[in-house]
UniProtKB/Swiss-Prot annotation:
Lineage of producing organism: Eukaryota, Fungi, Fungi incertae sedis, Microsporidia, Unikaryonidae
Gene3D superfamilies from the UniProt entry: Glycogen Phosphorylase B, HAD superfamily/HAD-like, Trehalose-6-phosphate phosphatase related protein, domain 2
Enzyme Commission (EC) number: 3.1.3.12
GO terms of molecular function: alpha,alpha-trehalose-phosphate synthase (UDP-forming) activity; trehalose-phosphatase activity
Coiled-coil boundaries: none
Record keywords: Hydrolase
Family as reported in the entry's similarity comment: In the N-terminal section; belongs to the glycosyltransferase 20 family. In the C-terminal section; belongs to the trehalose phosphatase family.
Residue ranges, compositional bias (Basic residues): 459-470
Pfam families from the UniProt entry: Glyco_transf_20, Trehalose_PPase
Originating organism: Encephalitozoon cuniculi (strain GB-M1) (Microsporidian parasite)
GO biological process, one term: trehalose biosynthetic process
Catalysis performed (reactions): alpha,alpha-trehalose 6-phosphate + H2O = alpha,alpha-trehalose + phosphate
The protein's name in its UniProt record: Probable trehalose-phosphatase
Length: 718
């Protein structure tokens, strides 16, 4: 298995210039187009004509992108860093592609399209520019679709069964839908999410594609809440959209992007503070945002203090020269009317960037907010459009600067912590169990990139590195057709059963032997089911492995039937129960369940000896899904090893259903179930495994419903 990272740009760049010259040239060249008469005096534009005939590779600085180049599990798909189509010939592109493969990078020679900028602007609360002033939406969306198709095609060239895809950019919102539900896809949302999504032309195609993700990580709780609300509106029973009825909702969480904090902190001790920025407090701003500068203007008009504004350029302007001209005019206005010194800064290396940060007193630049937090620099958190709230926050932060800020902020996470959190959640929700390599890596490749691939062996993307699969390969389950008496699979199972001397049947109850019902207490077995179990018990060992409580099992199943209750925590044999262990957070987990029960009308809390089940099948979908998700996330913090999602249920338990398989004799074994919890049994069963229903599974076979499964059991008695 590979982790395929889909991003707008690769972490590796290709150029004919030296790295520092290439970075400054890439960022500065578009500034020539700014329609402002004084631009030469305001901006130090870096134009390098000292290009070389030979191409060479280099990695982006650590502050621009977390360094995962030495992580053998990660494969990267995207445009080369700082890509410019005018710079390379077709032969250059071929050579770059061949060279980058040695570093698990698969380049796409494609520039960003305008629709990506529209998504960024609208979700950033600027709806006018693209919705009102630009009406060429259909063509823009068509080009955006073509752009995503290029990434899809490149990923499918290296994709193998069992790989996962990690989408890291809003330029690729259509990619999850193109990959489909069969490929596990996770997304790190790079822009804020809100109901303004509906202002984006063709937004429903974007939203439907995003819903194909298994796991989505937002960088703030408000984005997650907005997304969850929109999902519930679209999929809810009462007011939902019929077009979304078959959608499987992704797991959503809040988490920050990881950075190379160890490397950056180490460099901090080796560089000196940047000089030449005047005496006032230094505020860091993005160079192309009039909105952020207006917040500073509000601060100056309200408080009138002397400051230095440092405009940081770490990205190209995407051709938006008119906006940059407006920023420059506003800068002139501030310099004339207030005590303001302004400077532009284009860092071409990590030491340059850190040297500049050491002189800053406040960060109002979202793209480097995490790095600033790492160095103890206060970050403006308010909405950038609430100018006077921004003004007050700037004043408060500058007044308190230096009182409690320290390097190495605990709010900032490292790249491996980020990978661990993201991949653990994605693989878990996808039903995949792997040993993910989480060891920190020394950045060796970064310092030895070469067009000649010196010292590096070309990586075969079809060979699976790094991640070791714990269980057997999951193949599509073969359906057993019970109304066809000539079904070869059913006949094989029956023949093997009759030929074997030692025979064991291990079965779930709800959804397997009987249909799921609206209320759990109503699911008592019929006399037909009881008789079937007793008759089977006379010719083989019958084991019921269920999540139900001990009390329910005593009511439901004849005493001669062996039962593992509460997901294996309690075992009944010969009518006597043996209880397993519990876990330390059991009482706290129960109180959390009671809290959500009181706030979720229609829910039920089923208490068991070693845990409980929170049922939300009868809750309005608008409320139930949101409350269940909140309960699950809270329980994951309290007792993550003992909480599981099921079919309209959140369960807290101290054991796994696979306990029922531990003392199975050799011979014929059949294991059947319908829920996610039953996958634990399938993974350790050495005999026949049968999934009841149409959900994804690692079982070898499946039957349509409980009625068909009972028909199969009936054939064993013939």
């Amino acid at each position: 298995m590979k982790i395929i990272v889909a991003a707008e740009e690769l972490p590796i760049c290709a150029s004919r210039m030296e790295p520092s010259e290439a970075i400054k040239n890439w960022i500065s060249t578009p500034l020539k187009k700014i329609p402002h008469p004084d631009k030469a005096s305001k901006i130090q534009i870096e134009f390098g004509d000292r290009s070389k005939e030979s191409l060479h590779l280099f990695a982006k600085p650590h502050f621009m992108v977390p360094d995962m180049l030495d992580d053998d599990e990660m494969f990267f798909v995207g445009a080369p860093g700082f890509y410019s189509p005018e710079e390379f010939s077709d032969e250059d592109c071929r050579r770059i592609e061949e060279s980058m493969k040695a570093y698990r990078c698969y380049p796409i020679f494609q520039k960003r399209v305008k629709y990506s900028k529209m998504i960024e602007e609208i979700l950033g609360k600027n709806t006018y520019e693209f919705v009102q002033s630009n009406f060429d939406h259909a063509n823009m969306f068509a080009r955006y679709k073509e752009y995503n198709t290029r990434w899809h095609e490149k990923i499918m060239e290296i994709y193998e069964e069992g790989d996962v895809v990690w989408v890291m950019d809003h330029s690729l919102f259509l990619l999850p839908g193109m990959l489909g539900n069969s490929i596990p896809v996770g997304m790190s949302a790079s822009v804020p999410f809100s109901s303004l999504l509906k202002c984006i032309p063709f937004w429903e195609q974007i939203f439907s594609s995003i819903l194909c993700c298994r796991y989505i990580e937002f960088n703030e709780s408000s984005s997650k809440e907005s997304f969850d609300l929109l999902v519930s509106q679209k999929t809810g029973f009462c007011m939902g959209d019929p077009g979304y009825k078959d959608i499987r909702e992704p797991l959503t969480c809040v988490g920050k992007k990881g950075i190379d904090k160890d490397v950056l902190l180490k460099m901090s001790s080796e560089v000196h503070e940047f000089e030449g920025l005047g005496k006032g407090k230094v505020i860091l701003l993005p160079s192309d945002s009039q909105t952020h500068l207006l917040g500073v203007e509000a601060y100056l008009s309200r408080y009138g203090k002397e400051i230095t504004v440092l405009f940081l350029r770490t990205r190209v302007l995407n051709g938006d020269s008119d906006k940059q001209a407006e920023v420059m005019r506003l800068r002139e206005y501030l310099e004339i009317n207030y005590k303001v010194l302004s400077r532009e800064f284009t860092p071409a290396s990590d030491p340059e960037f850190i040297s500049m940060l050491k002189r800053c007193d406040l960060c109002h630049c979202p793209e480097v907010a995490d790095v600033c937090s790492l160095f103890g620099i206060p970050v403006v958190r308010n909405n950038p459009y609430d100018f006077f709230d921004i003004a007050d926050e700037i004043n408060e932060n500058l007044m308190q600067r230096g009182e409690g800020s320290k390097e190495g902020s605990s709010e900032v996470i490292g790249k491996m912590e980020w990978k661990k959190r993201f991949m653990t959640s994605l693989l878990s929700i996808s039903g995949m169990e792997y040993d993910v390599d989480l060891e920190p890596k020394e950045p060796r490749i970064r310092s030895s990139l070469s067009m000649d691939q010196t010292g590096h062996k070309k990586v075969d993307a079809k060979k699976k590195p790094g991640i070791r699969k714990k269980n057997r390969e999951k193949e599509e389950a073969v359906e057993i057709i019970l109304n066809n008496k000539e079904d070869a699979n059913a006949a094989r199972i029956v023949n093997d059963f009759k030929k074997s001397k030692a025979r064991t049947l291990v079965m779930d109850y709800d959804g397997t032997l009987t249909n799921i019902v609206a209320r759990p207490p109503m699911a008592a077995p019929t006399q037909e089911i009881k008789d079937l179990l007793i008759r089977l018990g006379k010719i083989c060992r019958v084991v019921i492995s269920t999540g139900r409580s001990v009390e329910d099992c005593d009511k439901f199943f004849p005493k001669e039937i062996e039962v593992f209750a509460e997901h294996g925590a309690c075992h009944r044999i010969d009518g006597k129960w043996k209880e397993g262990g519990t876990f330390p957070q059991k009482d706290l987990a129960w109180r959390i369940g009671q809290f959500f029960l009181a706030r979720t009308p229609g829910s039920e809390l089923e208490r068991k000896k070693t845990g409980y089940a929170f049922h939300f099948r009868n809750v309005s979908p608008l409320i139930g899904v949101k409350q269940a998700r909140a309960l699950f996330e809270l329980l994951m913090r309290v007792c993550k090893d003992y909480v599981k999602k099921g079919n309209h249920v959140i369960e807290v338990r101290s054991s796994k259903k696979s306990c029922a398989m531990e003392k199975i004799e050799e011979g014929f074994v059949l294991c059947a179930g319908d829920d996610v919890a039953d996958e634990d049994m399938f993974d350790v069963c050495k005999g026949y495994t049968i999934k009841v229903g149409d959900q994804s599974t690692s079982a070898a076979y499946r039957v349509k419903d409980p009625e068909n499964f009972r028909m199969l059991l009936g054939r064993l008695l013939e």
